Amino acid sequence: MTILLRVLFIVASAALLAALLLLAGLLYEWIGGGVDRRKLMKPGRLVGIGEGRQLYMVERGPRGRGPAVIFESGFGATSLNWLHIQTALAERVHTVAYDRCGLGWSSACTSERTPRHVARELRELLRAAGIEPPWVLVGHSFGGLVMQRFALECAEEMAALILIDPMRPVEWPPFNAGADGRVRRAQRLTRVGGVFARVGITRLAARSHFCRSARFSGFLIRLAGRQGEFLAQRLDTEIGKMPAEVRPSIAAHWSAPRFYRGLLAHLEAVEATALEMHEAEAIGDVPVTVLTPASAAPPANMDQYGPRGRHMIAERSLHWIHLDEPELVVQTILNAVAQAVAEDRRAQPMVAAVD
């Protein structure tokens, strides 16, 4: 009986300790999330787009000096990706970067994360924020497909389209069966991250990795095995190219349970995204610039970008061209804005003559 009581006591104590740790983790995440929102959201603002949804956006530069430049990020990325580009353009161009539903500081997503749905949410944001056309749209990776869809649906409001190594539908399921396993592994890893995020473990890891000694995050990375180490290395490589002041915000985003729900929604829509954009029609009379790294094959079908499409190679870049060669992206944007302004001026006398 004495042995049984001891066993029961040990089990009960372990269960109580586990419950207390779980409660502490939940409380840590709840408090940390609130502190993050109060401290880190200041550069931008939340804009309502209907049905209770809000999108977080950051504006830089003066309005009214030519077309506004609108940025769209890749998978899992937010407006932070464009901060250095916005800063470089701030004195000459009006720019807007934002977080898609499900990512960053924006509301949870309520629709499938395909280019069509995301482009419509962006259109609602621009309308609600009073960002008038014409626009120069800039999209990276998945964001390139979003901006391509936007250009197809709102061609008359476009000034130019700049695609930075856009996602290629033929490289993803269902067209590339070999990528299916990679997508499924990413989904599983994201689900695990979401569980850890709810109890504060991801917050500890993110703070450790981005803002402190990285000992705790290093332990978790080793625990995740080869895939975790590969992912961490890629993140370090790309995030290391971003301004140091954004790291607390990156840590905050990667700490939040809603981030993993949003990222999972994007991953679950990969096949639908590939199908939608593989069958997309060609863009009309809009200037389109496609930037790809030298290590990538050129676009297989430039016809999809219309009669004014052109291809440029970023010689010193990998996939994240706007981080590897920001000066190239800045100059490409300035050229597009200048061309749009010049074309608008040439059109004005023609409009007056018709009137």
Stretch-by-stretch model annotation:
Residues I70-G74, H140, D165:
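The conserved beta1-alpha1 loop
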Residues P115, M158, I162-G309:
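Flexible "cap/lid" subdomain of the alpha/beta-hydrolase fold that forms the substrate-access gate
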Residues E59-W105, L145:
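Conserved HGGG/HGGXW glycine-rich cap/lid loop of the alpha/beta-hydrolase fold
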Residues L4, P307-D355:
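Catalytic active-site module of serine/aspartate enzymes centered on a nucleophile-bearing elbow/loop
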Residues E51, V58-R60, A97-V138, C154, ...:
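Active-site loop/oxyanion-hole signature of alpha/beta-hydrolase fold enzymes
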Residues G139, G143, M147:
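Gly/Ala-rich beta-loop-alpha elbow adjacent to hydrolase catalytic centers
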Residues M1-R45:
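N-terminal membrane-anchoring alpha-helices
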Residues W30-P67, L80, H84:
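N-terminal signal-anchor transmembrane helix
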